[in-house]
């Protein structure tokens, strides 16, 4: 199930309502200058920005030129949320195509600058991993994040547990949120 929206060419948030509600609750609980980092973008990106206060920030890291154009094209028309947003576009390198909804998307090859594009992202309060190489990205945030215990999510975890199970052993705790989202603790 997705959530219908009217965000230009984006007509849905590809998450369950209870997952969006949980994440927006976490955003509201961040400090007044809180930061969220997400890998992968879409209608949910706009929802996170609409939920944030003026001083909170969202950094989005995207590898897909199509999604980058859709999301940035829409957000650039919204002066009320644009100042909260930093978009980092890091396309796949070396000709590797990760694809969608198949195990190939989990391979970190060609994502040299995508996984950790700069160290400024490491102080976030929330990390939402919803792009490619999700297990690798979540694990890097566990070890590299500068906060004592940030919120780390992997979207679409449930239903693809075998893709991510190798990384789960390194987290102290995990909790199912909604239908497909998992929250992880350092």
State where each predicted segment sits:
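Long, low-complexity, Lys/Arg-enriched
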Residues: 2-9, 13-17, 69-72, 165-176
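Short, charged, surface-exposed secondary-structure boundary motifs
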Residues: 67-74, 96-99, 161-167, 183-186
